């Protein structure tokens, strides 16, 4: 027979026992919590990079022959790289996948809200 490991602590006359299952649930909750912070950190990083790259510094250009600065197109290149290498391990891929995940989460929340509204409407019609 396999023994389940338990930890215990005493308080007065009562002994409290916590099982491994409760500890595993706490670990899962911690993982979800920290994963949310990582996603938010990546989202802010992407937003900051976008803000930096969208403004170009063409003030040094003296005539039309100098043309636009090259860093204007660098943001597009990163986005294309993210789309082309979806299964790769690049940083832009992580940003891309988080944007898609965030969009899907938003859609899921919207669908749940719509479902709840329709359920409430059907309940109110049944009561009348």
From Swiss-Prot:
Statement: the UniProt record of this protein carries the keyword Nucleus: yes
Positions of short motif Nuclear localization signal: 111-118
Record keywords, A-Z: Cytokinin biosynthesis, Cytokinin signaling pathway, Cytoplasm, Nucleus
Tissue: Expressed in seedlings, roots, flowers and siliques.
Chaperone found in the keyword field: no
Compartment(s) of residence: Cytoplasm; Nucleus
Domain notes: Domains SOFL-A and SOFL-B are required for function in cytokinin-mediated development.
Full protein name: Protein SOB FIVE-LIKE 3
Gene field: SOFL3
């Amino acid at each position: 027979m396999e023994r389940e490991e338990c930890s215990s602590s005493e308080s007065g006359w009562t002994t409290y026992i916590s099982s491994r299952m409760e500890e595993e649930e706490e670990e899962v909750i911690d993982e979800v919590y920290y994963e949310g912070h990582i996603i938010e950190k990546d989202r802010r990083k992407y937003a900051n990079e976008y803000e930096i790259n969208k403004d170009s510094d063409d003030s040094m250009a003296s005539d039309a022959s100098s043309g636009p600065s090259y860093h204007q197109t660098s943001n597009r290149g990163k986005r294309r790289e993210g789309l082309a290498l979806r299964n790769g391990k690049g940083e832009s891929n992580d940003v891309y996948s988080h944007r898609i995940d965030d969009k899907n989460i938003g859609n899921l929340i919207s669908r749940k809200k719509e479902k709840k509204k329709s359920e409430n409407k059907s309940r109110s019609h049944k009561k009348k």
